[in-house]
């Protein structure tokens, strides 16, 4: 999902996760329509990784406890993780390549590690849909690329949930994201295959500025006036 600030991304996410009701139209998620199914049950199948969740986790929470909390939809557990919860949390940490960080407090995890742990939290909850709301915010270029490569590996696993990436940056769009929604001023500007949507023409319209999009090896780059571009 792409769009400038104020394009409607946050409002749409709030609708998708059941926290905001639209004034018109309908919302269908995972084959079920809000209003015709219990949204509380449907929301349990949707995971969200965002900066707001990161900020609510206390510094002394261990990575394994953060992950285990996904099973019970809670934050900042006061009890140790044991038994089947521990087994499931360790498996999820291994899947997000953070098994060696299980006993590390939240305060001592890097931003990239925190993002992986939160994805592990979503995996242990067995969400069918995982929304990543600007997951690379705050990461330096190296950490961002490492996180994106991890995300690409995760997307190819058999147990991976459906993924939605919300971003401002075309550099973060991986080949695994085959469909793209572009918003502009609260309306849908484009909805379809990523290769046809992430183009100079579409993004120039979305950001109301002349932009140049380049594509190489399945990845995208964005430039301003004067950069050579391909794909539209």
Residue ranges and their predicted role:
Residues 83-101:
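Conserved ABC ATPase "signature" region
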Residues 105-109:
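Conserved ABC ATPase signature
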Residues 25-35, 42:
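Conserved ABC transporter NBD signature motif
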Residues 2-4:
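The feature captures the beta-strand-to-loop junction immediately N-terminal to the Walker
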Residues 130-134:
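Catalytic Walker B motif of ABC-type/P-loop ATPase nucleotide-binding domains
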Residues 201-232:
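ABC ATPase nucleotide-binding domains
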Residues 17:
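Helix-to-loop junction immediately C-terminal to a conserved catalytic motif
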């Amino acid at each position: 999902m792409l769009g400038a600030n104020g394009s409607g991304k946050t409002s749409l996410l709030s609708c998708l996760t059941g926290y905001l009701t639209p004034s018109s139209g309908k919302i269908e998620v995972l084959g079920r329509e809000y209003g015709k199914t219990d949204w509380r049950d449907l929301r349990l199948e949707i995971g969200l990784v965002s900066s707001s969740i990161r900020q609510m986790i206390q510094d002394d929470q261990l990575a394994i406890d953060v992950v285990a909390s996904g099973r019970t939809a809670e934050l900042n557990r006061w009890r140790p993780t044991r038994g089947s919860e521990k087994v499931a949390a360790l498996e999820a940490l291994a899947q997000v390549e953070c098994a060696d960080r299980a006993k590390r407090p939240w305060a001592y995890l890097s931003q990239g590690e925190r993002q992986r742990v939160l994805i592990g939290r979503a995996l242990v909850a067995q969400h069918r849909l995982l929304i990543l709301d600007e997951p690379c915010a705050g990461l330096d270029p190296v950490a961002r690329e490492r996180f994106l490569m991890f995300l690409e590996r995760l997307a190819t696993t058999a147990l991976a949930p459906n993924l939605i990436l919300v971003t401002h940056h075309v550099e973060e769009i991986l080949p695994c994201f085959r469909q793209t929604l572009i918003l502009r001023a609260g309306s849908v500007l484009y909805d379809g295959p990523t290769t046809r949507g992430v183009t100079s023409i579409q993004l120039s319209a979305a950001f109301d500025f002349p932009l140049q999009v380049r594509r190489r090896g399945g990845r995208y780059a964005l430039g301003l006036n004067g950069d050579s571009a391909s794909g539209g």
